[in-house]
Amino acid sequence: MGKRLLDKLWERHVVATNENGLDLLYIDLHLVHEVTSPQAFEGLRLTNRTVRRPDLTFATMDHNIPTKDVWNITDRIAKQQLDTLRQNCKQFQVPLADIGDEEQGIVHVIGPELGLTQPGKTIVCGDSHTATHGAFGALAFGIGTSEVEHVLATQTLWQRKPKAMGIELKGKLPQGVYAKDIILHLLSKYGVAVGTGYVMEFYGEAIHAMDMEERMTLCNMAIEGGAKAGIIAPDEKTFAYVKGRKYAPKDYESIKKKWSELYTDLDAVYDLHILVDVTDLAPYVTWGTNPSMGVRIDEKLPEKHDANDERAFSYMGLSPGQSTYDIPVQHVFIGSCTNSRLSDLEIAASVVKGKKVKEGVRALVVPGSQRVREAAMHKGLHRIFEEAGFEWREPGCSMCLGMNPDQVPEGEHCASTSNRNFEGRQGKGARTHLVSPAMAAAAALYGHFVDIRKESYDGAISYS
């Protein structure tokens, strides 16, 4: 019987197996940020250990930093975490993309764009959405702080091998429907626990048609379905994306041959298989307090089925049977490790070009990295957004989470391109609706959700 992509990735990295069936995996890349690393570095210090492979470790500032005045950090804990990361990286000789550095940005944006993320690698980070890197045919997953310390000290991690789930995406996406809508559809249909104990492998016609940035969006939210990771077999698009980037392999052609072996064999069998025809998908909007509480834009909000629905409706200030078009939007956030890359900003700009943000709506665009920001400005996207009434910010996690100055006031609704809509995720009492960049941009213009398939906007942008 053939092997799944998961099998090939796993077997290449097993160092040892213990009596409990756990495998010791070698870790090829360890990404670090300011929030989950301080205790891990302190653990090394207390035990007089060093970082085993600083050359396979890379740190950045992202979660806590302000995106308006990046040097004016007024929160005491945030400042302490940022200062501590600087000190730790200096002491342990770990490369750091600090505030103002041209390589700085959200950890799951800079990894791929710098060429750190590569097919065949095992990648870990003290962050839930490390699965993003699986879009390159890497086995990437989030870890806790004690595991961060273990990887820093040993460059290995004890893990139990997950099962393999194959998610086949058949057909061609309609105009106005994106990778974000696919994952929100999957979550709304199968729930937030469908992937528990699995690694999700996405494949099929729709995957082949996607660019790398859409694939990253898809894998980014595999964790929201309970999966250990999301992966996609690398192809020519993957290889072309990695080629020539700063940290890409110098012996690219020989490495590429090894990358080409990373696919699921035709006679391999998944532990669970899901087939989705994307041909008739619509834009999605979440209405509740987890990512599975979502509906098509042309559907009414569902009836209450249990206490969780009751609580979600109450928290969100919405009602069963309500039209999605009637959901008010006071804030719009285009950013996060899910949707802050150049193509995301291009799509959003194509929606708002020549138009104005609705009076009373606060709209932010937060590029995922300094390089994304510079590329967008080179194309004139910042002018399109600013002329429409958006705020153009510096890179960071921003309004994805209530951990920095960018927050949604209590009781107000935000159309967000991020990945989580939990209670208080964007600030105390904030009401978060997860959508694609196009849907978020359109909501900024109208002050409520609209069906972008029925709205007139440019499919391509003129940068003159």
Swiss-Prot record:
**4Fe-4S: is it a keyword of this entry?**
yes
Which cofactors are required for activity? [4Fe-4S] cluster
InterPro entries reported in the protein's UniProt record: 3-IsopropMal_deHydase_lsu, Acnase/IPM_dHydase_lsu_aba_1/3, Acoase/IPM_deHydtase_lsu_aba, Aconitase_4Fe-4S_BS, Aconitase_4Fe-4S_dom, IPM_dehydratase_rel_enz, IPMI_cat
Give GO BP annotations, semicolon-separated: L-leucine biosynthetic process
Q: In which pathway does it act?
A: Amino-acid biosynthesis; L-leucine biosynthesis; L-leucine from 3-methyl-2-oxobutanoate: step 2/4
Recorded hits in PANTHER family, A to Z, give: 3-ISOPROPYLMALATE DEHYDRATASE, HOMOACONITASE, MITOCHONDRIAL-RELATED
Share what the entry says about its subunit structure, partners included. Heterodimer of LeuC and LeuD.
Write down what this protein is called.
3-isopropylmalate dehydratase large subunit
**Source species:** Bacillus cereus (strain ATCC 14579 / DSM 31 / CCUG 7414 / JCM 2152 / NBRC 15305 / NCIMB 9373 / NCTC 2599 / NRRL B-3711)
Upper lineage is: Bacteria, Bacillati, Bacillota, Bacilli, Bacillales
